[in-house]
């Protein structure tokens, strides 16, 4: 998507970019399940590097997956518009509208997944994906979004740097910007 966004190369978009993103969307759509709440849910996935990928790291609706699916839906629509196509845009808009909301704590912090707030220092802030790089929650989205952004960053920083790696600092610099 970034290659398309910055280069605006329609030939590359038609031959490579759009087919790749369309296939990713089809995969997501085929693997989502409708819950009793009427929302579409990720049945099972993990939050990267949390709990060394053991069974405690696996659950439904990881925030990172929800953010990536939302962004993929946006990319499908944007790319189809650029290519004057309308193959998947309606389906992408429907999936995005029905996708489960981001799980939040009572303090409005983004969770790793439903009922699992970040509970330890962690080098991979994947649960912050809706803020950056997905940019699905921005300070321009109103008071609720700003509250979630502020609370989530404060929580991440409060848990300390014990398990951070070099890339963690770069990610947090991008988040803070």
Regions found by a protein language model. Name each.
Residues 23-79:
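Acidic/histidine-rich catalytic neighborhood
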């Amino acid at each position: 998507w970034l290659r398309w966004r910055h280069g605006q190369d329609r030939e590359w978009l038609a031959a490579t970019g759009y087919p790749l993103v369309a296939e990713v969307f089809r995969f997501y759509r085929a693997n989502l399940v409708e819950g009793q709440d009427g929302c579409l849910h990720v049945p099972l996935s993990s939050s990267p590097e949390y709990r060394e990928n053991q069974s405690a790291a696996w659950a439904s609706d990881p925030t990172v997956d929800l953010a990536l699916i939302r962004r993929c839906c946006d990319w499908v629509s944007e790319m189809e518009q650029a290519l004057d196509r309308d193959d998947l845009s309606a389906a992408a808009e429907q999936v995005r509208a029905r996708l489960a909301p981001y799980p939040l704590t009572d303090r409005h912090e983004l969770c790793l997944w439903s009922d699992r707030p970040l509970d330890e220092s962690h080098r991979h802030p994947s649960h912050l994906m809706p803020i950056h790089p997905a940019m699905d929650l921005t300070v321009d989205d109103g008071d609720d979004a700003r509250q979630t952004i502020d609370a989530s960053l404060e929580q991440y920083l409060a848990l300390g740097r014990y398990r951070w790696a070099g890339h963690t600092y770069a990610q947090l610099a991008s988040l803070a910007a």
